[in-house]
Design a protein with these regions (language model features):
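N-terminal Lys/Arg-rich, disordered targeting/topogenic segments
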Residues: 1-28
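Generic detector of intrinsically disordered, low-complexity, polar/charged segments
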Residues: 7, 19-21, 35, 98-101, ...
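Extended, non-globular alpha-helical segments
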Residues: 21-34, 103-106
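Hydrophobic membrane-insertion alpha-helices, especially the h-region
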Residues: 30-49
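Catalytic glycan-binding domains that act on GlcNAc-containing polysaccharides
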Residues: 47-215
Length: 215
């Protein structure tokens, strides 16, 4: 064997090793982009299927958060339920007024606010029952009414239905066999229960850590 042949043969293993490393590099070079593309596709699918927190909060906004939080704490009501009622009652329009005479954010009837004040459930000295276009006052009376209903009824569905149709009517429906939702005879109340329940779940999903107090 010549010295040249020996040297040539001696180099072959190294050459093969370099070629193997090169093939490994190019293999990873081709695979990594595919992995990245797959990861991006999965992320996009997740984002498309599950709205981001920002998108959800656009669908379920909050205004007058400090007033809601304060009244909810004072009366022991979930502030997110208050927000859901406001969204469905007035869509956050503090100047809203119905043909029936319901006023403001939570569409409180003047006779309801007067009765709540008479019962001592709201401090009428601090919150004038006739000033229902004022957001702070309206939220206080609307939240106090939710608290009153919660103390006299046994489920959130009952409370929501009673906020729309009145507690007496809900008690009539409850006296019948079957589920409340099946016994509701007012189409408006049936739809109201569906909408507020959906909004309530939407607010809970959008604010998992509770109401964000921002003005």
């Amino acid at each position: 064997m010549s010295s040249r042949t020996a040297r040539t043969r001696g180099r072959r293993p190294h050459a093969r090793r370099h070629r193997t490393r090169g093939r490994g590099f190019w293999r990873w070079y081709r695979v990594v982009p595919l992995v990245l593309v797959g990861a991006v596709a999965i992320a996009c699918a997740i984002l498309a299927a599950t709205p981001t927190t920002l998108a959800r909060r656009t669908l379920y906004p909050v205004s007058h958060a400090q007033d809601i939080q304060a009244s909810a704490e004072r009366h022991g009501v979930d502030p997110l339920l208050v927000a859901a009622v406001i969204k469905c009652e007035s869509n956050w329009d503090e100047n809203a007024q119905s043909a029936a005479g319901a006023i403001g954010l939570m569409q409180v009837m003047p006779q309801t606010s007067s009765e709540l004040a008479r019962m001592g459930l709201v401090d009428s000295g601090a919150y004038d029952p006739s000033n229902l276009f004022d957001p702070t006052t309206n939220i206080e009376y609307g939240t106090a009414y939710l608290a009153f209903l919660e103390k006299n009824l046994s489920s959130t569905d009952q409370v929501i239905a009673a906020y729309n149709a009145g507690m007496g009517k809900v008690e009539e429906w409850l006296a019948q066999p079957g589920e409340l939702a099946d016994n509701i005879t007012y189409p408006e109340t049936r739809e109201y229960l569906r909408r507020v329940s959906e909004a309530y779940q939407g607010y809970r999903d959008s604010y998992p850590n509770g109401l964000v107090v921002e003005q």
